[in-house]
Amino acid sequence: MKKLLVWSLAIAGSCICGCTNDNSSAFDSIAPEIGDDSSSSVLQENSDNQNESPLTEESSSSAKSEDVSSSQSNSQESPAPSDSSEVTPESSNSNDSLSSAAEEPASSSSPTQVSPILSSSSIASDVSSSATTVAVSSSSGLTEYDDNHKPKDSVLPAAGFYSSLTIEPLTPQKGGVIRCTFDGSFPTHESEPITETMSITENTVIRCSEFVDGVAMDTTTQTYFINESVSMPVVALTVNHHDMFDSTDGLYATGNLTNSGIGNWGNMGGDRNVTDDNNPKCTEPCKAANFWSDKELPVHVEYFENGSSTKSKNWEIDAGISIIGNWSRYKPKKSVAIKMDNDEYGDKVLKYSLFKTRPETKKFKSFNLRNNGNRFWTDYIGDAMMTSLMEGTDVDYQRSRQVVVFYNGEYFGIHDLRERLNRSFVETNYGIDSKSINMIKISGTSFEASGTNGASTTDFQQLYSEVSSTNYAGENNEKYEQVKSKLNVNSFAQYMFAEMYFHNGDWPTNNVRAWGGNGYPFKFVAFDTDHGFGFTPGISGFDEEGENMFDWVLGAKKSSTGNGGMGGFGGGFGGGWGMSSGASAGPGTMLSKLLENTDFKRLFINNACILLNSYLTYEKVQSTVQSMMATIPSSERSRDEKRWPRNQSNFTWDPNGDKLVAYAKNRSEKIKQEMVERFDLEDEVSVTIAASGNGKILVDGMSLPSKNYQCKFFSNNELQLTAVAESGAVFTGWSDGNTDKPRLVQPTAGQTFTAVFK
């Protein structure tokens, strides 16, 4: 912790910042480029004519920690780099040290009015506590941490939501001088002490350290919300204001366009499909801007689960913060990574149940606060909704929830709190040591491993080389049986079909993630589907409405005429050039080769049938959109839209997710028909598959959603049924007397297959 403090003090200044309200803040004079509503001078880099970038979210810069690392969407067959991997900035270090004699506090005088960050004149004044005067209190109870985290004592009142608050002069606890800042920076020996009664009238963050013999003790950080009404979880971020928001130096800012080593893609020629023009300093993606830096800053995070009704913060932690994304960095609201897995921040692991979809998961080394990527201008939940449809399948995805973010007390609107996709993701969700596997970023035939500490692409490179060069034709192919020890074929099949259903044009030569190796068969992760569900403007050469996804991935079944434009090349060049085409590089090639095998082809089709029957349905999309949007009350949407106006001519703002639901109306039938044509499938027949007793049945390796399951399959595609006993039970056979395990059956209408367990 001392190491962090020394570094931070070397860059931090102290001041008391003033601001007025949602439409005019302390950011006005410091960072007039970052953006607010049109009536404000706050962060005014974004003009009224703002457009979305053509590609996808979460691209990375250089790697240092355990994150997928890439500073560019390299060699991806799209018109411009996709927003598709996760940033892994390097942490800054300094050997600067502190030396200053202890100073005596100044004498107190009359109360001081502090107007730090934000007034809530436009917000309802429903608050959780009445006017309060506090002299000294302990830190609020911090829970859910690993053993090496020790809650800090605080001479400040507890952070939280107040109607008003008065702070009395602070009493040193160790015989030194308590010095404080109000701009998110760490206190230095030049920071002012609080020596007189102070009335907190607006949102304020205070950081204080007691200096003893010139050395700063632990810093305490408290965020106070005055007359705030927030009905969503709140994430309060405290970060050095200058380093984050200064118009010249701040990470969030465009700056003077001197960011080195990246180049300004905004000056590229060619078919870039630029759609976003919110920044008057440079065109999208403006790679020379500060927000493309891989720098990481220290940040303090406070979390209030129930918004302004939270009596005290649920947890707080020191971490690092960095800007993430690829083209979505150009958006006025940025995505950031919060990373705790660094010795400099003192805390290794946050133990808290962040996601209701998996409450038992309580170990996080990092998370993202996402601006909804390339869908920033269109909706709140598109990517999160699509990928969450994979819950219960063999495909992993990043869990998420919507939260409201404040920087140094300043309202920054709704963000998607999202699992971070790196090796720690596997440790969090599976309990597998993160260093024993590899998370691979797959861009065509280019592979990149997440993190350091032995991270390697070797296993996946060998897998790809093997699959792309092997003849898998025929039944009972030994080579196919061998590859199943290296590739989770159910995960791969379900993943590929789900992305086809999503109609994601920025895939499969981009936005592909898989983890495994070292004895773990590679499993795939649904990731960054921003360009799915009819997103426009989309990828050049990709028809957002009519593109046949089997042609896009595998190449046209017959020679076809494309629609021109290089785009993502579709299935090789054929998707966009009208030539006879082959499979797209990378996963498309793998799928094409594996489909040569009779067993895998049967598995792919039957897994797809189960997905279309239970997971990728109109009803499922409708209910998922409704449940997700229910977590974002209309009052919160209105406030976010006022803070970040969605006024781009190239996009249609869909705050309720209605367009997502409408797109799903006929999507299942459309992709099913494409599959029928690709594989010459015949009539659909309804089959019931049941388990009697303590056990379950797998259909071509895929678990069923219920023990008595009815699904439509194709009459000319066999089913492989495998009975799996559970909890000491024994499989005794099928109800028709058959005892095969597994069992191959030809489906006919009205059939029932019941496995008996005793």
Regions found by a protein language model. Give the residues of each.
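Sec-dependent bacterial lipoprotein signal peptides
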Residues: 1-17
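Short secondary-structure subsegments characteristic of cysteine-rich extracellular domains
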Residues: 13, 191-210, 618-635
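Bacterial Sec-dependent N-terminal signal peptides
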Residues: 15-59, 64-68, 72, 77, ...
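Short, compositionally stereotyped local motifs that mark structural "simplifiers"
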Residues: 135-136, 140-305, 312-317, 677-758
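Middle-to-C-terminal accessory/interaction subdomains
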Residues: 233-238, 242-277, 288-291, 300, ...
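Conserved ATP-binding subdomain of kinase catalytic cores across diverse folds
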Residues: 280-449
